[in-house]
Structures are given as structure tokens and as C-alpha cells.
Design a protein with these regions (language model features):
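Extended substrate/RNA-proximal surfaces in nucleic-acid metabolism proteins
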Residues: 1-85, 163
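Active-site environment of divalent metal-dependent phosphoester hydrolases
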Residues: 7, 63-67, 91-94, 120-124
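A general structural detector for well-ordered alpha-helical segments in enzyme core domains, enriched
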Residues: 45, 73-77, 102-106, 132-136
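Conserved, mostly hydrophobic/aromatic
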Residues: 60, 118, 153
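Aromatic-anchored helix/helix-loop segment that forms the rim or "lid"
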Residues: 83-86, 91-93
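Short loop-to-alpha-helix "cap/lid" segments that border enzyme active sites
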Residues: 96-102
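Short acidic/histidine-rich active-site segments
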Residues: 111-127
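Mid-to-C-terminal alpha-helical segments outside catalytic/metal-binding sites
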Residues: 129, 133-166
Length: 166
């Protein structure tokens, strides 16, 4: 069961308490905001986590209107060291063509670090990655596919630095 840090207000509380749920007990945290949150709110939340020594992974970046409206804004988050996760179903088009287009642009520009399912457990929204893995391997290369699905997740578990995507 993966816990994620939801939004800046909750982040403020847990930052003060020093009790942030991390992935595999390391420094990486999954952070999720409301799709309606503004860019400054998201950027500030990520910055505060980084300043506290955490490595934020922005969950389903393609679903935030303020991010998906501009590759420059996504680039700003990427440039400040925020790790970017996109959902497999978004890549495959289940969330509309605009979300699909932006998710695929993140892949094309090598700005995504992870692909996930958004399945918070194995009962609801069951994980299904097979078609997405094949798609990414065909369209973006086997090496990048391995980074997204194997190498980078392994580095989170080991609490190791994740290299820039190339």
C-alpha cells in the first residue's frame, strides 16, 4: 500500500511534524495536488519538500491543468529537480486526447521519470501496464522504457539518485 502526500496544506502539517510517508523508507515522496491547483501552489509545495530534504515525485503530472497547459511549466518543475510520473492510462488515451498528447510529449522530451497505474490498491483501478509498456518500447525505445519501469523504480527502493533522462 503506497501512501502519498496530498497537497500543500497537508504537506505543511506533516512537514512541521516531520512525519512524511516516504517510498521504501527513503527520501522519495509521492505528492499529489488537486487538478485545479495553481502552478505557484504546486511549485511551492515541491520546493518546500525539497528544502526539507525530500525528493518529490509529482503524481500524474499530465492531469494538472496548470502544468499540462504549458511545456515550459513542466520544464520548470523538471528543471528544479522534481521527478515526474505519468499514468499509463493517460498515455494510452483513457483520459482524453489532450491528456494523452501532453503525457506523450513528456515522454518524447524525456521529462517523465516513471509510469504508474494510479491503482491505489489491487481491488479498485486494478493495475494494467502491459499495453503501455509495449507502446513506450515501440515509440520511445527499449532503453527509455527500462528506465521508466525498472531502473528508476529500483533506484527509489535503494534511495539512490535518479539520473536525468536521455
Amino acid at each position: 500500500d503506497v501512501e502519498q502526500l496530498v497537497g500543500l496544506l497537508h504537506a505543511e502539517e506533516v512537514l512541521e511534524q516531520g512525519d512524511i510517508p516516504t517510498m521504501a523508507g527513503g527520501s522519495y515522496v509521492v505528492v499529489e495536488f488537486s487538478p485545479m491547483d495553481g502552478f505557484d501552489h504546486i511549485r511551492n509545495g515541491i520546493y518546500r519538500l525539497q528544502a526539507a530534504g525530500y525528493q518529490p515525485v509529482l503524481a500524474h503530472a499530465e492531469r494538472y491543468r496548470c502544468v499540462s497547459s504549458s511545456m515550459e511549466k513542466a520544464g520548470e518543475l523538471y528543471g528544479m529537480g522534481c521527478y515526474i510520473q505519468v499514468n499509463a492510462d493517460s498515455i494510452m488515451g483513457a483520459n482524453g486526447w489532450q491528456v494523452r498528447h501532453f503525457a506523450r510529449m513528456l515522454l518524447k522530451k524525456r521529462m517523465a521519470h516513471f509510469v504508474a497505474t494510479d491503482a491505489h490498491d489491487d481491488m479498485r483501478r486494478a493495475p494494467c501496464l502491459v499495453n503501455c509498456v509495449k507502446y513506450i518500447g515501440r515509440h520511445f525505445g527499449e532503453d527509455y522504457m527500462a528506465q521508466l519501469f525498472q531502473v528508476n523504480p529500483s533506484r527509489i527502493i535503494a534511495d539512490e539518485y535518479i539520473d536525468a533522462m536521455v
